[in-house]
Amino acid sequence: MANATSFEQWKDAAQTLDALENKSSWKENIASDVYNYDLLSDRLILLKKLKDQNDIEGLYRALREGLHHDLGNMGDIRLYQQCHFGTKTLIENYVTEVCSCLDYVCDNNLNDLTPAKKLDLFKDILLSFGRPALLLSGGASLGVFHIGVVKALWEQGL
């Protein structure tokens, strides 16, 4: 991983190392004292069901109810120290489904959801999660490292 020249190379190396160290069993086992896996599992099932049933009003309510950056303690640092890449599969699946539902709400012309109501939802999301910022400190002595960080973020479209 130390010799990777791009995020993709680093990611591939990290995932390979996780496989060699048999980290997949930890990732696949949803149970943990660190986070509320029952809450996330139930919400994941609910979001999928509402989207599949095209229940726009229900999906809207469910998304608004879940506007917490640390829902079920899924942001606990201990969940991100076990593997070189990623965390519990349940958390990854939940985040992916929330993004999918938000894309669905954003990209579709939904009769039950006016543009104003959509805008309110996304404004509330902005208030809950804020705007990401990148602070590069350390002056010229760390400038070379900063260039690498910025390059990797740029290559990932971030």
Spans of features found by a protein language model:
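Patatin-like phospholipase
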Residues: 1-158
